[in-house]
Each structure stands twice: as structure tokens, then as C-alpha cells.
Amino acid sequence: IKVAMLGGAERQALGLADFLIKNYNCKVHLVTTHSNHPTKEFFEFAMACGIKDIHYFGEPSLTVRKEFSLLNLKRTIRALKYIKKMKREVAKFHPDIIIPFLNTPSKIAALIYKSVGAQVTFWHQLGLDNYTYDALENKAINNVPFVIANAQNGLEVFQNYYKTPKEKLFVLPQYVSIKKIVLDAASLKDKFGVPNDSIVIGMIAHYRTEKFQELLLQSFSEIKTGKNIHLVFLGNKDNNEETIDKYNSIVALSKSLNCYDRVSFLSGESVEEVLNCLDVGVLVSEIEGTPNVVMEYMLYGLPVIASHHAGCIGLLQPSEFLIPNDKNILRDKLQDLIDNENLRIKEGEDNADKIKKFSIENYIDSLYSIINSSS
């Protein structure tokens, strides 16, 4: 994995490790490529999933351009040293398979897997992520046996830029990485400053620029209703400067929109606790793969309003609540669900039924089939 912070990709990785350890008696070694400092939330979740150690072998330097220059020569030397170190350290685990999450771990896995004795790896594309378009990335993508994306749009770079053969490209949405836990909603609402008699709208998402909390705030502030309504945001504001700035900006925006007293801005709280408080789940964003949080909303039987990204469509269709990122449309969809309890119930029941096929058992079966078809 990339960082020891409990986002969607990391939950998927740890949940998969937990399942493989408990059901197949696998020995799983976890390597982070960009972080030697796990968050408390990540560390506790990793230990609960049977991970004994979190390994880190230094910051990767893996960008090598197709050019002749002193700078590029230095980059090449650094990259070769890093790859050599990764081969040496990962070989100690005697891996049979390397399962990467996100692009940089995929790049590393593709470059080292044969040398460390692994039988297979793959490129694992999971939504918004960076590409370097350099010589090493090109080599890694050519080397990798196959590519898995969690939504169709995740394959576009491989199809259009790298011209990867279509028989090497697969779409495999992730599984639901949490179990539904029913908790005392009244006490949790009190904990989070949510009036107990309110209809609660929530958006669980990183405090990052590609997540559109501002859009939801603007739409929420324009809703006209005699009912008590409350908005909840959950992310982790303390990850870095970007997340702190984003958090502070939406707090300031809520004050300028005169809705600050009807919004709870949460950071680092339990996802399951917040899900138990919600009546409506929202995810509006610039880009997504197959978003974990939409799957979690569905697991908890919530109506969901989501940007009409390919991954959201794959989860929710057919649905009238797949929308463009438009303030007025979002406001009107929120209004419909606030005004109509029966509609909320029906949408929630439909979503709970749709999500049943996204189990970890089905995910493992599909992954096994892909590996076998590519061997």
C-alpha cells in the first residue's frame, strides 16, 4: 500500500489480509511505500486484521525520463538503488503473490515481483491517482501480467496512452470492507452535536480538493423545509496541510452561508458510528473509482445521492439520484428525500439489496478467476 492512513484503499487491503489470514491460513506481510508513521486508527485496524508488522523501506524514487541529462542520470541511479533495496527486502518474505493497492505500489510490484520469487502480481488502479508517464512506468506496465481497475474509467490510461492489450485489462469493483454494526443512534447524535429529531445528511470523504464538500454545503444551505435538518461531514483533517486547509475552508463557508449551527464537522471519528446517525448519504466529487463510502452507505440501507461517475453508476444504477455536480440538482434531490420519508425508505431498501453481491467472497472468486485466466 502507499500510506499507513485508513482511507478506502487501505481498508480494502487490510480487510483482504484479514480474510486471507482467517480463511486460507495465509501469511501476509504489509509494506507501505510512502509512510513510516501509521495513524492510530490505521495501526489499530491493522492489528485487528492480523497484521503483526508494518514494513517501510524508504521513500521511493522511481521517475526516469527518456532524456539525456545529468538530472536524469541521478534519477536513474536513485531509482536503481531503490529497486535493488526493495528486491532485497521483499525477497525475505518469500512471496507467492504481491497484491498492490494504487499506482506507485503497483509500479514497484511490477518491477520486482519476478526477482523476489512471486508467481504473480498485477497493476491495481483504484480511482483518482497519479501517473508519471516515465520510462519505468512504461516498463512496469509492459511487464505486469494484467491490470485491474475498480471501475471502467480506471482503464482509460492503459487503453489510450499505453495501448495495453484488451485481454490484459479487467474491471473488478472492490468488496464492502466493513460489517454493519447497529449502535445507539441517539447517544451518537448527542456525541456529534446532532439534534435527535433531525433528518441527518452525511458526506464521509477525505478533506481534499477533489471532494466537493463545498457543493454540498451550498445546496444544503438553500433547502427550504419546516423539518429539522442537519449535515455531517467526516474526514481526517490532520493528515497534512491540504486537509487542514480544506477543513478550515468549509467551516468558514458554512459560517458565510449562515448554516454553521446545522453542520457537524468531524475528524477521525468512527465511520460505523457516523453511519448509524445518517438518514441520507452523499458523495459528490471530481472523480471516483468504485467508492467505498457509497458501498458503506448502501450496506447501512441509506438512500444515496452521488456524482454520476462510472463506479457510482455501477453500484447504484438504476437510480434517479446519480447526478452531475450541479448545486441546484443536488439541492432538489436532497429536498425530495427530506420531504418524502417513504422515498427514503424505498431507496435505502433498494440500495441494501443491490450491495449484497459485493461481498469479499465474491471478490476473491473473481480475483482468482482473473489470475487463472492470465496465467
Positions of the model-derived regions?
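Conserved acidic donor-binding segment of nucleotide-sugar-dependent glycosyltransferases
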Residues: P318-N328, D336-N342
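Nucleotide-activated donor-binding/catalytic signature segment of Leloir-type glycosyltransferases, i.e.
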Residues: D53, I244-G268
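Short His-centered aromatic/hydrophobic patch
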Residues: A79-Y82, P100-S106
